[in-house]
């Protein structure tokens, strides 16, 4: 299929027939007989192979995509990693990976999940029941499913303070400080079972962090109710992005999927599948329509003030189910997925997924909707038919939208104004171009396209399958993130980028919005607990290398300056509870140190002018070398020392 081929006349019957067949495959064990009877293929294989004629090589870009040695990318891209649990930072247009920021995962390189500083972040926002559950399981979750990283706003554009992201696996939300590119807060959401969609308040600032609860469970979920879906409830959460505390929650009808907010600070809105509130695939896809749920922020805030809520696990929960004064439910084609606000501040687009259509709404009509002056479907101003499996929509700031078509393996460029005119009956075609991508695209994102400053230069298509696009690396294949030039009249594919499991969403931010530091401030709160303990022990972290014993608790303080640690040896007793504090006093950009104790499973990063600490039980007697694991000096190999663990028998 060529770039300019437009799929027309795709009927709902045809699409649902294909989808129903795929659903049937899932119920039957994931295999179907091929049309020629040759054998069995998986659903995913059938989709990718049917959509994947051999594509021509990527064409030269209209814009300059090469970033020469010594030059810098124009954009940061903050990528999710799905089940890997980290946030990744990519440069655009080079598509080079710049950094990985551990969040919900355990990171061997940095010690995230082992250092005291990271463990505080990972545990302080836990619910009490979870803390008890994990008490004999290492104290923290060892996995995460990081989706939807989004950067904080002021007045409708990025302000570079924070990135927020959700953990679908363990119902958490994290905040990453963009001045140091480190996670500083994680909260587990009470009452909510999974967090899928996450977006931020755009105006006047962030503000609220909006978190969709996808799956319904009994409330409280204590085992007293099990297989009774009528008593399951889904929860929508608004966090305070400054305090990382829950501001309020709303109980809704159906499963929430993706969410976005307006540019006026009045509404946020979520796609909702499973209006049937079923628990099986057949039940969840039975109805012809689901809905978009619109949340009235002012009314919800007033409800909290006047006490119109039920307190559950210490937070106010408002009843926003169908018929509530705090929400409105707009019918759309069944199982909608993506929800994306256009940079014009007027239009929002809900993608159909099981329908070839997307639904365009005008946020200026929401006031009338909540005042009951119009009906829910009256806010719909266009519903163009785009192709098979529309999932997510991005924008160029010029009135055009770009929607991924999962089943067609395409990105379709279409015009919002033309779609509105066609909706009114005018004989115009809103589709401008279709571009083959490789393969099965999910999220897509344009440069600055989620702000009022969309610049219409670049689009990334995050494709779920790569198949034949890269060297074969075995059964587990990389994803394929494809860079598309959208600066001209026609989309042009310019780059294939492999990525490990598994990006769900990304945010493209102009580099002028982000201003990280290179050397830590000694007053930074990240290691404030270490500073406090050192002060109590009479230790100057930037000068002293000493050992403090308090019963069987031993605190080892040492500086590090390449190529030497402040202590070349220290001695403890078997069974001592040891905490080692390392302060890197090299105030030199990019001179990171590491601290690793051989055969003790200890490893951590110590960045310039930072203090890092790790606690462990000295259970193995003997001599154990420690060394700097970051190559920081020509004498790197000699930057080491010995830990003596005196056996109990001595």
Curated annotation (Swiss-Prot):
Spans traversing the lipid bilayer: none
Name by which UniProt lists this protein: Nitrous-oxide reductase
Residues noted as binding Cu cation A1 in the record, renumbered to the chain: 593, 628, 632, 639
Keyword Chaperone attached: no
Enzyme superclass (EC): oxidoreductase
Binding residues for Ca(2+) 2: 273, 276, 284, 290, 335
Listed GO CC annotations: membrane; periplasmic space
Gene3D superfamilies attached to this UniProt entry: Cupredoxins - blue copper proteins, YVTN repeat-like/Quinoprotein amine dehydrogenase
Ligand binding (Cu cation Z4): 504
Residues annotated for Cu cation Z3 binding in this entry: 148, 443
Endpoints of the signal sequence: 1-46
Name of the gene this protein is made from: nosZ
Residues where Cu cation Z1 binds: 337, 392
Cofactor(s), by name: Ca(2+); Cu cation
Binding locations of Cu cation A2: 628, 630, 632, 636
């Amino acid at each position: 299929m060529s770039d300019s081929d437009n799929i027309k006349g795709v009927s709902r019957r045809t699409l649902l027939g294909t989808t129903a067949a795929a659903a049937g495959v899932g119920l039957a064990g994931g295999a179907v007989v091929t049309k020629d009877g040759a054998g069995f293929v998986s659903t995913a294989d059938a989709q990718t192979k049917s959509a994947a004629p051999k594509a021509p090589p990527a064409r030269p870009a209209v814009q300059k995509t090469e970033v020469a040695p010594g030059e810098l990318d124009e954009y940061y891209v903050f990528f999710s990693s799905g089940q890997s649990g980290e946030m990744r930072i990519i440069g655009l247009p080079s598509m080079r990976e710049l950094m990985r920021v551990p969040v919900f995962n355990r990171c061997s390189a940095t010690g995230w999940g082992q250092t005291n500083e990271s463990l505080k972040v990972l545990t302080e926002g836990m619910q009490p029941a979870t803390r008890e559950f994990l008490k004999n399981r290492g104290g923290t979750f060892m996995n995460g499913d990081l989706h939807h990283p989004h950067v904080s706003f002021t007045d409708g554009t990025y302000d570079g303070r924070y990135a927020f992201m959700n953990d679908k696996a363990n119902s958490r939300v994290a905040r990453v400080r963009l001045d140091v590119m480190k996670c500083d807060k994680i909260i587990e959401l009470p009452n909510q079972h999974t967090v899928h969609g996450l977006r931020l308040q755009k105006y006047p600032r962030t503000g609220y962090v909006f978190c969709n609860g996808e799956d319904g469970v009994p409330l409280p979920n204590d085992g007293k109710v099990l297989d009774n879906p009528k008593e399951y409830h889904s929860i929508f959460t608004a966090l305070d992005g400054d305090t990382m505390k829950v501001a309020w929650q709303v109980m809704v009808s159906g499963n929430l999927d993706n969410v976005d907010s307006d540019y006026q600070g009045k509404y946020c809105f979520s796609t909702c599948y499973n209006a049937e509130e079923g628990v099986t695939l057949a039940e969840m896809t039975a109805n012809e329509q689901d809905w978009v749920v619109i949340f009235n922020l002012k009314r919800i805030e007033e409800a909290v003030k006047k006490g119109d809520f039920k307190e559950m696990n210490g937070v106010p929960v408002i009843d926003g189910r169908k018929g509530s004064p705090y929400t409105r439910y707009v019918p759309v084609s069944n199982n909608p997925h993506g929800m994306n606000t256009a940079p014009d501040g007027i239009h929002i687009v809900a993608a159909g997924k099981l329908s070839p259509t997307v639904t365009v709404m005008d946020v200026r009509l929401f006031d009338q909707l909540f005042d009951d002056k119009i009906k829910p479907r009256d806010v719909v101003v266009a519903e163009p038919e785009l192709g098979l499996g529309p999932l997510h929509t991005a924008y160029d700031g010029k009135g055009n939208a770009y929607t991924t078509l999962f089943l067609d393996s395409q990105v379709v460029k279409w015009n919002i104004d033309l779609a509105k005119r066609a909706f009114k009956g005018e004989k115009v075609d809103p589709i401008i171009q279709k571009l083959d991508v490789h393969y099965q695209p999910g999220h897509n994102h344009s440069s600055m396209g989620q702000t009022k400053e969309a610049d219409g230069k670049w689009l990334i298509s995050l494709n779920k399958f790569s198949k034949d696009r890269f060297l074969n690396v075995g059964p587990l294949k990389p994803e394929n993130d494809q860079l598309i030039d959208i600066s001209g009249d026609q989309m042009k594919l310019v780059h294939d980028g492999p990525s490990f499991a598994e990006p769900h969403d990304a945010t493209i931010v102009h580099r002028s919005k982000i201003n990280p530091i290179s050397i830590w401030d000694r007053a930074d709160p990240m290691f404030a607990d270490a500073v406090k303990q050192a002060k109590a022990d009479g230790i100057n972290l930037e000068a002293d290398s000493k050992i403090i014993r308090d019963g069987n608790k031993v605190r080892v303080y040492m500086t590090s300056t390449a190529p030497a640690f402040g202590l070349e040896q220290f001695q403890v007793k078997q069974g001592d509870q040891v905490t080692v504090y390392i302060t890197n006093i090299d105030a030199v950009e990019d001179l990171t140190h590491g601290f690793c104790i051989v055969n003790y499973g200890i490893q951590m990063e110590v960045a310039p002018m930072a203090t890092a600490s790790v606690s462990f039980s000295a259970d193995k007697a003997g001599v154990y070398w420690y060394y700097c694991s970051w190559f920081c000096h020509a004498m790197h190999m000699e930057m080491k020392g010995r830990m003596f663990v005196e056996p109990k028998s001595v």
